[in-house]
């Protein structure tokens, strides 16, 4: 099948919003465990080598110089606004704190030591990054429950169960059982609501908006679109709030079973109106599954990474890519490596890491191939049109940034990469190979983790300042910083660490 230029308008039926109680799965950070283990073994080799909705109605616009294919539902009244920023200096209201996914907060102390403050056992595993809103830590579980905890001691302030998670027996494959809320929620200071997508029995994916003050559900709607099999699609990437909309990325289950096609769905924050959807124009796969979900710029445009698709020759199917989408999910621009077809065939695509937005209109991405790319956000470059390409590492998860310095979650150790004013990459330090978790930065310290230990690294040198064994951690979890505390999800709940 060849990818053709098309803009498909899908009339999302208003009945979707009224189906009521339904059923989702937030497919977060533990996808592809077998494949992740494979990349752990292949990563060093890569570095060595690199160093020497159905019922659619279709029209066909012409867009040059790229062939851009978009699938979007009609959305009425969507007005671009500035992207979300934290409500105050200590809040952490979305994945990696802001829509650029910097993962950086300046006003925190650098540690002499790390100590465990408390742990809370909840009703399921936590893959989503915790949020911090005022004096509440918001935690989402695979039990389909949202919790507000006291950051001082972990006491439950409120908890709201929004459905019954999907058991293993109802899933064709996967590696998170049961499946409940996997992707990181987002908080909207304008409405006071925390938004999450839950996978519930049925199956269906449900968007809920919960009052941060008391846990009351104020918004609830099904966010599966026409032609989408809820059993085959997993919602694991973080939600993004921009333009008065909640953007929801979908990929497939671990094992890539059944017929799924990567897509991003948008709902108005009030839960009203039709859904928007962009669907990758491939016959199968091309999941949008990376932990960070979509990044957003100041104009409300979205940047989302896409995994390998079914096409391995002929015309590009817009998989193995970075896509730039408008607030109404029309395809504006795209990038793919020149080797996209071979990367699709070998499952060494860009979809394992989220897009990183940098100053000077640059974008950084690395994935499973070991190559890092810098792109211009104003002209992503189409096929092979990068600004710079270098051997960086095999990367899974979300990178953190401080200005034009990037801290990349490499499977052989977090790596510092500096991008100059011309977009050229300069490789800096690299941490020990067991420190590979998606990093965040507080003050002058980078925090990352191994399978069971949190590490504090000097931002300039990568030297380990402090570490703490916190017990088993889920794959692709991301810590959250608030003041002198760090919060991280576990297989049974959440652990709080004190910076001392």
Where are these predicted regions, by residue range?
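Feature marks short, highly hydrophobic, charge-poor N-terminal signal-anchor/signal peptide-like helices
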Residues: 1-9
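Membrane-interfacial entry segments at the cytosolic side of transmembrane helices
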Residues: 30-41
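Ser/Thr-rich, Proline-interspersed low-complexity disordered segments
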Residues: 57-87
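Extracytoplasmic/lumenal domain signature
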Residues: 87-90, 95, 103-124, 132-138, ...
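C-terminal motif of bacterial Sec signal peptides marking the signal peptidase cleavage site
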Residues: 49-52
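Conserved P-loop NTPase nucleotide-binding/switch module
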Residues: 182
């Amino acid at each position: 099948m060849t990818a053709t230029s098309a803009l498909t308008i899908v009339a999302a039926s208003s009945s979707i919003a009224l189906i009521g109680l339904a059923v989702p799965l937030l497919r977060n950070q533990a996808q592809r465990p077998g494949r992740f283990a494979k990349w752990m073994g292949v990563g060093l080799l890569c570095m060595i080598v690199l160093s020497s909705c159905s019922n659619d109605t279709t029209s066909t616009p012409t867009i040059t110089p790229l062939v851009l294919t978009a699938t979007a539902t009609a959305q009425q009244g969507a007005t671009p606004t500035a992207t979300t920023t934290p409500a105050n200096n200590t809040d952490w209201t979305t994945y990696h704190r802001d829509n650029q996914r910097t993962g950086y907060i300046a006003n925190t102390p650098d540690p002499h030591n790390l100590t465990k403050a408390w742990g809370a056992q909840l009703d399921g595993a936590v893959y989503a990054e915790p949020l911090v809103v005022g004096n509440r830590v918001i935690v989402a579980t695979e039990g389909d429950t949202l919790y507000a905890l006291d950051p001082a001691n972990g006491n439950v302030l409120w908890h709201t169960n929004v459905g019954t998670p999907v058991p293993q027996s109802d899933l064709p494959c996967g590696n998170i059982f049961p499946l409940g809320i996997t992707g990181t929620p987002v908080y909207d200071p304008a409405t006071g609501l925390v938004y999450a997508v839950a996978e519930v029995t049925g199956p269906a994916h449900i968007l809920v908006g919960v009052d941060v003050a008391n846990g009351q559900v104020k918004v609830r709607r099904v966010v599966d679109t026409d032609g989408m099999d809820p059993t085959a699609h997993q919602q694991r990437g973080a939600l993004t709030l921009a333009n008065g909309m909640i953007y929801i990325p979908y990929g497939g289950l671990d094992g890539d079973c059944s017929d799924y096609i990567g897509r991003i769905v948008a709902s108005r924050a009030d839960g009203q109106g039709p859904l928007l959807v962009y669907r990758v124009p491939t016959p199968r796969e091309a999941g949008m599954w990376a932990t960070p979900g979509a990044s957003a710029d100041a104009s409300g445009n979205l940047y989302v990474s896409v995994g390998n698709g079914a096409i391995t020759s002929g015309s590009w199917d817009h998989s193995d890519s970075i896509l730039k989408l408008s607030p109404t999910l029309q395809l504006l621009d795209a990038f793919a490596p020149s080797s996209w077809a071979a990367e699709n065939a070998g499952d060494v695509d860009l979809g394992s890491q989220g897009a990183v937005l940098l100053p000077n209109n640059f974008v950084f991405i690395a994935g499973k191939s070991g190559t890092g790319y810098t792109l211009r956000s104003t002209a992503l470059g189409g096929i092979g049109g990068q600004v710079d390409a270098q051997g960086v590492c095999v990367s899974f998860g979300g990178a953190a940034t401080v200005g034009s310095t990037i801290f990349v979650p490499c499977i052989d150790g977090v790596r510092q990469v500096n991008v100059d004013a011309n977009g050229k990459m300069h490789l800096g330090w690299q941490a020990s190979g067991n420190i590979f978790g998606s990093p965040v930065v507080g003050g002058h310290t980078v925090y990352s983790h191994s399978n069971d230990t949190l590490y504090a690294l000097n931002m300039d040198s990568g030297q380990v300042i402090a570490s703490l064994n916190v017990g088993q951690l889920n794959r692709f979890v991301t810590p959250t910083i608030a003041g002198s505390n760090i919060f991280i999800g576990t297989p049974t709940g959440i652990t709080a660490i004190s910076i001392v």
